[in-house]
């Protein structure tokens, strides 16, 4: 006998498949069995049809194709006997889905079986319909399902309700047919029918507002009574789960009450008492009770306001936070985050418990609790919360320190009551987790320090102390050497001592030692060492007695394999040795940096193709030169190399001061002496400028430390090129006249318009540079509200360069307007049009508003 004939039993086939030792053997067994089944199908063997289909279902579950057996399902369904129909419907649900065209052929059989006199066959048809019903089948069979909702047998009514749910999901328009039958099911005593009826009514309410109003008026009181009866019912072994009567029905009723009470005060008042009873009397020592309590809390927080109930609900969530089950604590944290918008004061009372969750061993709970704490922080509690988080930072796991550090820095920066507290907390974070502090954070710290002149001495002394215990934190080292370079005299002289400070004695040599250690430390990278060299140059001016030692330390890097450090060492040594008359001017103390400008730039997160600069476009980090010495002879470097033009740099200090080192293009020509000198001085003091073209000279710009991989192209000289450098040097040297020849031949456009804001663009062209377009953006407020913290951001494709000037104001008056100028250079003029993505952010009455759009309607020819 063929072991794989149609007469083979299902168990024998399963045994043969499981006996296969390799995948190839299994495929061979399945292939032979499928061949035998195909032969049986072709012979129309009715005796073994049900057995063949059972085998196909098992083969299908193993992942092998069984499409050739789909018609066998229909043949078995059409059979008169119950056993054949059972296998047929089971195969239909398993081998087919609602997307199969074969389903069109089974609709008539389903309709006949739904009207069958045998209730078990009716049940089979309902099961199949509930699993694979398509939209077409739903429209054809909805009347039969509606009729069966009133069938005498509760099992049929239950299955019909589940089918009705599927029908409503597929064809929402049919929901009105089930409103009255669904309402009738809510009065059922049989729990199985009742739970499906509640589920059906919930689905109807979600898709039909008319049905929602109907159930609110007709069924709310009945549902409340049903829930009260179940909550107060005595022990029933049939429905009891962990001492609670039918928790599944509890949860379904609470979900429906939540839908009915949301947005309706009368319905909410009707259910307040029962919700309070469920919330206060349900035991929380078992999982079933916790599930009911969680659903009850969700319902309380969703219905119309009742202060006492909400406090009760949030207290339940607070108890959840003390539960040993991580899942319960996690869902409690999630729910508390959603509750913040409803009753933040009640959530604040559980702050200590939430803070303990931050210290939990479970990573998911840690992160969720940290997010919740971050939302709870305000001006009143920032000090104790920041203190707790910073203390935990010392002992937290390495994997969690990054997120924790970022949140602490954001909290401290956002809610700091005073600058000295902000500086103290940031120094603690830098000391404990400096390696996790992002660049924009410590850049912002430097901006705050420059804006607190009365704290300069205190800050530099605090940093000096911190370095002795946390020298491995590179970010701390960078901030410290920057401050020592700027305020070394205050460190040594103990200037600006505060009452809370302990006296400290620091000599000039001690200050030099700290910076020298930063250069020689094995963890210091190129950026840190470059900053340390600049700090040493400044110290040599602050402390003339240490000049020789500083010169010696700087000279040790003349042979560095890092060209960046090598050239800085050579040039700084030359400044100390040959140009003492201008050294003090070169290394003057940094001017106060504009906090508002930096915050706006930082919030914008503009892409690299966008440059935003101030009205005075050039500022040099770590000192502004003001001397009138001959620039060509400054360092005896007469190189002809010029820096490559750049549209923007991500370097902080260049970005912060709005440095715009781009050169206007012009016809090639000989470099003027003032231009060469300007480039040298620019190269000397810059930190983030791009590397220049090397034309055989070793004296090019080797001072760039962040953009050395930028594309390099020769810069062309222009009569207007030195203008920004002349601004830097207070106007020394000739100031070439600026061309005013601009044409306004392009029409204005409405770049963006919403119900609250309108943006107009006006265009002018520079006749000497047709690729460049000057745009004046006019922002018009269409509302009677004042827009504060107004910020316009834009991004363009790579073939465009965009330069943004600051807006005329960061506040847009009611029904008023402000202007902002920008310059767009199209390197593909004539080939590609200008396009731009824009984003506008502002606040209305303290609420953040963000509008975005794409501008494609620029005039042709730009």
Curated annotation (Swiss-Prot):
Keyword Cell inner membrane attached: no
Alphabetized UniProt keyword annotations: Cytoplasmic vesicle, Golgi apparatus, Membrane, Protein transport, Repeat, Transport
Membrane topology: Peripheral membrane protein
Regions crossing the membrane: none
Membrane found in the keyword field: yes
Gene Ontology cellular component list: AP-1 adaptor complex
PROSITE patterns noted in UniProt: GAE (PS50180)
Start and end residues of each GAE domain: 744-859
HEAT repeat locations: 1-28, 29-65, 101-136, 137-173, 308-345, 346-382, 384-417, 418-454, 458-496, 507-545, 560-599
InterPro entries (alphabetical): Adaptor_Complx_Large_Subunit, AP1_complex_gsu, ARM-like, ARM-type_fold, Clathrin/coatomer_adapt-like_N, Clathrin_a/b/g-adaptin_app_Ig, Clathrin_app_Ig-like_sf, GAE_dom
Domain of life: Eukaryota
Compartment list: Golgi apparatus; Cytoplasmic vesicle, Clathrin-coated vesicle membrane
GO biological process, any: intracellular protein transport
Cross-referenced Gene3D superfamilies: 2.60.40.1230, Leucine-rich Repeat Variant
Functional summary from the UniProt entry: Subunit of clathrin-associated adaptor protein complex 1 that plays a role in protein sorting at the trans-Golgi network and early endosomes (TGN/EE). The AP complexes mediate both the recruitment of clathrin to membranes and the recognition of sorting signals within the cytosolic tails of transmembrane cargo molecules.
Record text on subunit structure and interactions: Adaptor protein complex 1 (AP-1) is a heterotetramer composed of two large adaptins (gamma-type subunit and beta-type subunit), a medium adaptin (mu-type subunit) and a small adaptin (sigma-type subunit).
Family: Belongs to the adaptor complexes large subunit family.
Name recorded for this polypeptide: AP-1 complex subunit gamma-2
